[in-house]
Amino acid sequence: MNQLDGIKQFTTVVADSGDIESIRHYQPQDATTNPSLLLKAAGLEQYGHLIEDAIAWGKKHGGTQEQQVAAASDKLAVNFGAEILKSIPGRVSTEVDARLSFDKEKSIEKARHLVDLYQQQDVDKSRILIKLAATWEGIRAAEQLEKEGINCNLTLLFSFAQARACAEAGVYLISPFVGRIYDWYQARSPLEPYVVEEDPGVKSVRNIYDYFKQHRYETIVMGASFRRTEQILALTGCDRLTISPNLLKELKEKEEPVIRKLVPSSQMFHRPTPMTEAEFRWEHNQDAMAVEKLSEGIRLFAVDQRKLEDLLAAKL
């Protein structure tokens, strides 16, 4: 049995890609997209029809060019998501514009609009996860959306404070970033030789997973942003893992046994009183890595969102 199939015995495997051909090849349960992945996929010839449809939608929407581009951009994200859903049995994650990361009300409005666009393509909201950055405002937006039956995936998650606040808000799923945490520490004090058990990104997800299980939070933990297969194998047993096509390929080509590393704890603890905004901001602020990586992640997604909009504007 190859390692990918071995992992699938213990963990739901999710494809971290907007490339539909890759998704079909690796047969994941779910798929995640983001502006960076959509920008990459939009440059591939085989997806031209999805872009043309989004452009036509933008023109039909009318208004200023800026409004047409915004409409086309939302439609493109949904077109990719709907196309991906034809190849997977589970859910697709579609991201709310990162520029709304500090605006609760506009994030809620955008999420409802994306769900509406999916429903116009006969895609039920039970097959969609709305991705939001795990800022205080994003978490509060998700809390409201969950009450409306719109499940959310809280992304760009780097600190324990972010994870705990998401669980306390009743968020459906979180995506703690393994690789970007590893990158930050590696740039400052490299792990040489590399020992996966000492990888700060791996340790972060393990701590979150254990805490959620010990306190019986139902929020799903989906490890994300991997740099190497060792990180993935060290988190086998995590609820879900979202993996890029290049690492899915490596795992599929290795015929080595896979051992479950994360197992729900039999120890149970009472849940603490939910964090206040002040407590959240203080706890998150105490983690220099998390502060830096969350800010950077929002900026990078915003840059790629603008590039995607420029690509669409040139075609309008």
Curated annotation (Swiss-Prot):
Top-level EC class as recorded in UniProt: transferase
Molecular function via GO: transaldolase activity
GO cellular component annotations of the record: cytosol
Active site: K131 (schiff-base intermediate with substrate)
Any single biological process term in GO: pentose-phosphate shunt
Keyword field: Cytoplasm, Pentose shunt, Schiff base, Transferase
Origin: domain of life: Bacteria
Pfam families: TAL_FSA
Catalytic activities: D-sedoheptulose 7-phosphate + D-glyceraldehyde 3-phosphate = D-erythrose 4-phosphate + beta-D-fructose 6-phosphate
Compartments where located: Cytoplasm
UniProt function note: Transaldolase is important for the balance of metabolites in the pentose-phosphate pathway.
Subunit-level organization: Homodimer.
Family statement: Belongs to the transaldolase family. Type 1 subfamily.
Protein's name according to its UniProt entry: Transaldolase 2
Encoding gene per record: tal2
